[in-house]
Amino acid sequence: MKIIKKVLLGMFMLLAFTSCSLLFPDSGPSVTHVSSVSPFTKSQKSVYIEGATVGVEKAIKSRLTQRNWRVSTEDTGNETFAIVFDQLNIDSYEDGGFINTTYHEFTGYVSIFDTRNGERLYVYDFTKQSLDGVLAGIEKGMSEVEKSMR
């Protein structure tokens, strides 16, 4: 009887540990810090996007505009920061179900630069992410940049 209790207790503990790991997944995208951000003012809160497709540019512009960033799709020389897609690969595949749906997976890495001194601030390396996953990583990097705003 004691053996059965120990086996059941072991199974219960295994179930408890696996369910806890499902309840608390990782906290989101991992953005690598490269160098410190020089302080900037609200009037300098501007960024341009380079190396992204038109659809990705529009999505980033929409998200950052909601966070009160001035966003440009080309370098005019007035921007304080730059979001540069050093590499961006898009894989498309179709769901062969009743309603045909096309999915896109993004792989690559994007850097956030300070255009005032040319320093790379953050790097986000992503593999097989949806567009929302890529945007979440960029937003996380830009929120880290915002912490240096005076």
Where are these regions (language model features)?
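Bacterial N-terminal signal peptides that target proteins for export
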Residues: M1-L8
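A structural "domain/chain start" motif
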Residues: I3, T18-R70, R150
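Bacterial N-terminal signal peptides
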Residues: G10-S19
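Repeat-unit-sized solenoid/scaffold elements
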Residues: G28, N78-A82, M142-R150
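Surface-exposed short loop/turn segments
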Residues: Q66-R67, G77-K128, D132
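Conserved beta-strand termini and adjacent loop/short-helix elements that scaffold enzyme active sites
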Residues: S72-T76
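C-terminal partner/receptor-binding element of secreted or periplasmic proteins
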Residues: L121-R150
